[in-house]
Amino acid sequence: MQIFVKTLTGKTIALEVEPSDTIENVKAKIQDKEGIPPDQQRLIFAGKQLEEGRTLSDYNIQKESTLHLVLRLRGGVMEPTLVALAKKYNWEKKVCRRCYARLPVRATNCRKKACGHCSNLRMKKKLR
């Protein structure tokens, strides 16, 4: 039987499958056609995410049904160099003691009119 897989980009892929095929088999066929690794694929049918150990017939997927393909979000830890850059960008600032405006490190006066461009500045406190 033929089913369709619709991606988030709007592209529709036609697949030739059997009702006894597992979700892993379907993901492998998508990898053959599109080159997307199965571990990054999430298949949705009737608002439910399809689990790997089950078959198409378990979900009552019939001929010409449409599955939706969503890519798994990648997560993880930031590289130490990026963390250092973010800390430098966010922490190395001066703060006006009157209006709490964030200012560059080299500032001598506040840029805001509300505090009268005062020169009462301090370094921003570091987070613990």
UniProtKB/Swiss-Prot annotation:
- Crosslink feature (Glycyl lysine isopeptide (Lys-Gly) (interchain with G-Cter in ubiquitin)) location: 48
One GO cellular component, as annotated: nucleus
> Which terms does the record give in the GO molecular function aspect?
protein tag activity; structural constituent of ribosome; ubiquitin protein ligase binding
Entry keyword Cytoplasm: yes
GO BP annotations, alphabetical order: modification-dependent protein catabolic process; protein ubiquitination; translation
Where are the residues linked by the Glycyl lysine isopeptide (Gly-Lys) (interchain with K-? in acceptor proteins) cross-link?
76
Q: Which SMART domains does this entry report, sorted A to Z?
A: Ribosomal_L40e, UBQ
- Annotated keywords: Cytoplasm, Isopeptide bond, Nucleus, Ribonucleoprotein, Ribosomal protein, Ubl conjugation
Q: Where is the Ubiquitin-like domain positioned along the sequence? A: 1-76
Transport is among the record's keywords:
no
Superkingdom field: Eukaryota
Family to which the UniProt record says this protein belongs: In the N-terminal section; belongs to the ubiquitin family. In the C-terminal section; belongs to the eukaryotic ribosomal protein eL40 family.
**Name used for this protein in its record:** Ubiquitin-ribosomal protein eL40 fusion protein
User: Could you tell me which species this protein originates from?
Assistant: Leishmania major
